[in-house]
């Protein structure tokens, strides 16, 4: 689960964790262990070549990110689905268990032991995370993947101006241009969605129901934008005081949300036998459970692939890949979920794609201008890789 992130959001679950921390994915060998020859086995050279391949890392990152959104959409798309809190609780349980197993295997060596004092200070941030991920799944339940992806860009605007208000700074003209394109793409996407709903069933009661469903999706999406911004900005304010290291944020977020999500599920969701049968029909029950488990593991996969991408390319390349990944992510919704392909929807996807490129370019130029006068400390790979806060 972690922080479904969207790649363009500058703040993320690990941002602000101590920039000098070594990412566990970037250095697996212990100093006490002898270096093994690269050709130790028949496939040693082949795997070593893949491990240092920029193309392989980029493809792995894109596939892990796309699969996360597609699986989330699949799970919540059932016509009778109404157990979102339960789904998110399973995600958190799986992700927490995976983190602890990775720690035991030595993959997350710098994951600190649980600290109740830190947990109390971090708990309000975890509550904001619950709001973010719940509204995210509700929006994804009512909206198509392309529209969800396009509207998710609006979070960037709210976060940017929230940073200006809370932490100072400014918004560059190029960033303003990207914001305008993001708003334009969202308007086009909404218009295309409504047009497709009306033309598909005509001006009937069915059309009214379809538009009502879309309106519910837009309402949840609007709440998700502000919940995501509140979580990211609040986390940035608190995380500097916590001295969290790599993956501590992911661990605390998932662990602390488990009891909240379970209680909310028991209080607000229908656990009757009839409702469970509706949510988990026999013909899709196994695939739903597999999807729920995978979605919890996907947070680990995304973090690994992100750190891998940064290690063999650069943080700038990683940011650009995140922007470019919006296009295949939106297209995946057209392929897997039969979202309507219209001139308006294609135009919205293209404009949203361009807005992501413009925004990434503006942030790259801004960082270069900040680095030129002085030397800035390098951000850790996992701090950069976990900027996926939000989807999904």
Swiss-Prot record:
Topology feature Cytoplasmic, residues: 1-55, 102-121, 169-174, 235-248, 309-316, 362-392
Start and end residues of each stretch annotated as Disordered: 1-40
Membrane topology (Lumenal): 77-80, 145-149, 199-213, 270-287, 338-342
Domain of life from the UniProt record: Eukaryota
Primary site of residence: Golgi
Start-end of Polar residues biased regions: 29-38
Transmembrane segments: 56-76, 81-101, 122-144, 150-168, 175-198, 214-234, 249-269, 288-308, 317-337, 343-361
Topology of the protein relative to the lipid bilayer: Multi-pass membrane protein
Subcellular location(s) per record: Golgi apparatus membrane; Cytoplasmic vesicle membrane; Endoplasmic reticulum membrane
Function per UniProt: Involved in the import of GDP-mannose from the cytoplasm into the Golgi lumen.
Protein name, per record: GDP-mannose transporter
Species: Neurospora crassa (strain ATCC 24698 / 74-OR23-1A / CBS 708.71 / DSM 1257 / FGSC 987)
């Amino acid at each position: 689960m972690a922080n479904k992130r969207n790649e363009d959001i500058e703040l993320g679950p690990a941002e602000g964790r101590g920039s000098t921390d070594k990412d566990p994915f970037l250095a697996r060998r212990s100093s006490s262990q002898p270096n093994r020859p690269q050709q130790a086995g028949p496939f040693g050279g082949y795997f070593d070549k893949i491990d240092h391949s920029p193309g392989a890392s980029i493809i792995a990152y894109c596939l892990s990110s796309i699969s996360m959104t597609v699986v989330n959409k699949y799970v919540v798309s059932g016509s009778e689905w109404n157990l979102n809190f339960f789904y998110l609780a399973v995600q958190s349980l799986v992700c927490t268990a995976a983190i602890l197993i990775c720690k035991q295997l030595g993959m997350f060596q710098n994951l600190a032991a649980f600290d109740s004092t830190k947990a109390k200070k971090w708990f309000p941030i975890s509550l904001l995370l619950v709001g973010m991920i719940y509204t995210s799944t509700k929006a994804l339940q009512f909206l198509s993947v392309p529209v969800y992806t396009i509207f998710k860009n609006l979070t960037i605007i709210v976060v940017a101006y929230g940073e200006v208000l809370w932490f100072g700074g400014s918004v560059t003209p190029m960033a303003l241009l990207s914001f305008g394109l993001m708003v334009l793409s969202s308007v086009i996407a909404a218009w295309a969605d409504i047009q497709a709903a009306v033309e598909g069933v005509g001006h009937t009661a069915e059309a009214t129901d379809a538009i009502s469903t879309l309106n519910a999706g837009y309402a949840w999406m609007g709440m998700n934008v502000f919940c995501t911004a509140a979580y990211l900005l609040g986390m940035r304010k608190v995380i500097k005081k916590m001295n969290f290291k790599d993956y501590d944020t992911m661990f605390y977020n998932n662990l602390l949300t488990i009891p909240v999500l379970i209680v909310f599920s028991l209080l607000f969701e229908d656990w009757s036998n009839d409702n469970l049968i509706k949510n988990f029909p026999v013909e899709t029950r196994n695939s739903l459970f597999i999807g729920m488990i995978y979605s919890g593991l996907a947070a680990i996969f995304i973090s690994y692939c992100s750190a891998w991408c940064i290690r063999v390319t650069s943080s700038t390349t990683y940011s650009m890949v995140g922007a470019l990944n919006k296009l295949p992510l939106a297209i995946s919704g057209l392929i897997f979920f039969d979202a309507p392909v219209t001139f308006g929807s294609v135009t919205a996807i293209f404009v949203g794609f361009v807005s992501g490129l413009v925004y990434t370019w503006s942030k790259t130029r801004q960082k270069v201008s900040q680095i030129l006068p002085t030397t800035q400390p390098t951000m850790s790979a996992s701090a950069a890789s976990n900027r996926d806060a939000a989807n999904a």
